[in-house]
């Protein structure tokens, strides 16, 4: 199988971020295979376990698990032998998790007090207005950076009784772009309108 053609075939079916992650993980694995003259798409479980153990010398368990999950998907989609489901591979990952596993660091949540302090130090010019809008938008919608960047002015909706909402066109959990309506405050609605008039 031509791996370049394979990754090209994923376009439109998977998000750009997923394809980028698959490609990066595969290249790391493929380079390792090349070093030992292994066929990346026809490898047995013992050799794949060696790859995992070598990753364990420098990478976190979370990164290793993500790479193994990516490679498992690639093996399945290319109809190749999938060593990731073999007991020896599963046990190798379990050993690494027991030996090196640490709880993943969670991002510090943006509380209302922190939000207020951040907005208070924003300047009164157009840059400050933009920063206030982004802070309020992130706080209220709890969206990823990539999702926040997709919002458009026409996504702002006004309903009866002074209610406002934003249309979220796409998210990681909405791969088929069905969209989702997110209620927002008067404050965020006013910031969006102010920004639209300022630019």
What is each PLM-predicted segment?
Residues 2-5, 47, 110-114, 129-130:
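Alpha-helix N-cap/N′ positions at the starts of helices
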Residues 3-20, 26-105, 121-124:
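N-terminal core-binding DNA-recognition domain of tyrosine recombinases/integrases
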Residues 67, 130-131, 188:
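Hydrophobic (often cysteine-bearing) scaffold residues that line and stabilize catalytic clefts
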Residues 98-116, 175-187:
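DNA breakage-rejoining catalytic core of tyrosine-based enzymes
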Residues 113-145:
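Basic, Lys/Arg- and aromatic-enriched nucleic-acid-binding interface segment
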Residues 146, 150-197:
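Conserved tyrosine-mediated DNA breakage-rejoining catalytic core shared by Y-recombinases
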């Amino acid at each position: 199988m031509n791996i370049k053609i394979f990754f090209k075939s994923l376009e439109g079916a998977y998000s750009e971020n997923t394809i980028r992650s698959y490609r990066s993980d595969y290249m790391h694995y493929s380079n390792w295979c090349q070093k030992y003259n292994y066929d990346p798409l026809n490898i047995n479980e013992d050799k794949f376990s060696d790859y995992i153990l070598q990753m364990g010398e420098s990478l976190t368990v979370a990164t290793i698990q993500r790479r193994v999950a990516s490679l498992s998907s690639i093996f399945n989609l290319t109809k190749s032998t999938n060593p990731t489901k073999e007991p020896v591979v599963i046990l190798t990952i379990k050993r690494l998790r027991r030996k090196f596993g640490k709880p993943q660091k969670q991002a510090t949540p943006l509380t209302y007090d922190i939000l207020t302090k951040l907005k208070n130090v924003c300047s009164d010019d157009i840059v400050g207005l933009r920063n206030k809008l982004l802070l309020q938008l992130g706080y209220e919608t709890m969206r990823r950076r990539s999702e926040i960047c997709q919002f458009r002015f026409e996504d702002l909706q006004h309903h009866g009784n002074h209610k406002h909402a934003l249309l979220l066109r796409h998210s990681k959990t909405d791969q088929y772009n069905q969209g989702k309506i997110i209620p927002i405050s008067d404050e965020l609605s006013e910031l969006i309108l102010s920004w639209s008039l300022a630019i």
